[in-house]
């Protein structure tokens, strides 16, 4: 892993405006390629690359999470889909996700998945307890995919690793 030369860093930073002028579809497509190539975590660990990603995608309010993932989340991030990956990056208590949907033209189906996670964790109306009764209720109203997204989001955003959440995911995935 070679560090970028200082002169190259200056040139890239100087021309970052050109990257920002690319179409939102192209930027999202390039991000998807980066995610599928399994190198996003490595890029976040390199300070210069992290700085560039933050400059190109200022909507990624939770990108800091990728600098301090536990072993389980590092090993399992790429087994999850791109929509869930986006939810980790953009969800917070603000309307940041709505702006992201507007700017990047995300499909209604994908928006619904991301909004479900946001509603569960950031809405004051709902209980965020992940007890058996609440999980069954989520599964009934939002399906297995919604439930698994909520559990995975909890795993990826928690400071401590909770094996019980993994067991819950496996239980509901195997349940009809």
Spell out what each predicted region is.
Residues 1-19:
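Internal alpha/beta core interface subdomains
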Residues 14, 46-176:
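C-terminal subdomains that position terminal phosphate/3'-OH groups for nucleotidyl transfer/ligation
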Residues 20-21, 25-29:
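Divalent-cation-assisted or electrostatically stabilized phosphate/pyrophosphate-binding catalytic cores
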Residues 28-36:
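Conserved phosphate-binding loops in nucleotide/dinucleotide-binding enzymes
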Residues 40:
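Catalytic core of bacterial c-di-GMP phosphodiesterases, primarily the EAL and HD-GYP domains
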